[in-house]
Amino acid sequence: MPKSSNFLDIDDLTTDELQTILDRATALKHGGDNAQFPGQTLGMLFEKPSTRTRISFETGMTQLGGHAIFLGPDDIQLGHGEPLSDTARVLSGYVDVVMARLFNHDDLLEIAAHADIPVINGLTDDAHPCQTLADLLTIKEEFGGFDDVTVVWIGDGNNVGQSFVIGAAMVGLDLTVVTPSGYGMDQSVLDQATALGHPPTIADTPGAAVSDADVVYTDVWISMGQEDQRNEKLTAFEGYQVNESLLANNSAQVMHCLPAHRGEEITDEVLTGTRTLVWDQAENRLHAQKGLLVELLSEN
């Protein structure tokens, strides 16, 4: 049973629960019992737009026998005109589970504090745990598990990276984080990984870090809402691009959560090349989130 009925970051699950969700996702992907929740409804709150998050959750809930309702910025004014606490209470009377993709993580916490139904973090500025589920499912499929798998994160210490650091520690991945000075993960995230017994190695030189990597993972340098930092970040991240030269002397597979800024953090040749896991990773958002929905709805 989950430590809470919500999924606000990856550590809302125990390690055993995380493994159970990944196993269930694999079973569902390969033809397991899908239509488990007829008549149930997922409410999807989108303050930030997304292709993968909306389609994967809406498709997943439909495949599980339920229904999903999309509420975008024009449909619901989060925190404007009506307190978030009231919105959460009202939604609790209409739907069975809420997925929220927001800017401010505190807004997500406010919704979760006043909802009587499970709340899922579809992304905030601080965390993206649904992406971590898909990432871990992809690695498990590719390597048969997590033992002796070495992953190198190259780029910004953003929300995707922070959830991945914690998820990697939970399953025991050998992780190295390579970021420019001033753009690393929050210290609280690194401390949490240390408490879990698997802190990442911190480095600032991509070339040396990837020599023994099984997976090289990158993400955009300029996240949504950071457009005014573009020139500053392009300068700071020079030399951190995942390209054919960086990968020339190793056999690492490549991951990226998408959308990619081709020619910035990754080249087109690498993104679409023979060593990419990116498209499996994108598909696995669907299956991992179905595994999560089954976990939450079965308990509630």
Curated annotation (Swiss-Prot):
Gene Ontology molecular function: any one: ornithine carbamoyltransferase activity
Binding site for carbamoyl phosphate: 50-53, 77, 101, 128-131, 257-258, 285
Residues reported in the UniProt entry to bind L-ornithine: 159, 219, 223-224
Main location class: cytoplasm
Pathway annotation from the record: Amino-acid degradation; L-arginine degradation via ADI pathway; carbamoyl phosphate from L-arginine: step 2/2
Enzyme class: transferase
Enzyme Commission code(s) on record: 2.1.3.3
A single GO cellular-component term on record: cytoplasm
Subcellular location: Cytoplasm
Superkingdom of the organism of origin: Archaea
Alphabetized UniProt keyword annotations: Arginine metabolism, Cytoplasm, Transferase
Family, as annotated: Belongs to the aspartate/ornithine carbamoyltransferase superfamily. OTCase family.
Protein task: Reversibly catalyzes the transfer of the carbamoyl group from carbamoyl phosphate (CP) to the N(epsilon) atom of ornithine (ORN) to produce L-citrulline.
Protein name: Ornithine carbamoyltransferase
Source species taxonomy: Archaea, Methanobacteriati, Methanobacteriota, Stenosarchaea group, Halobacteria
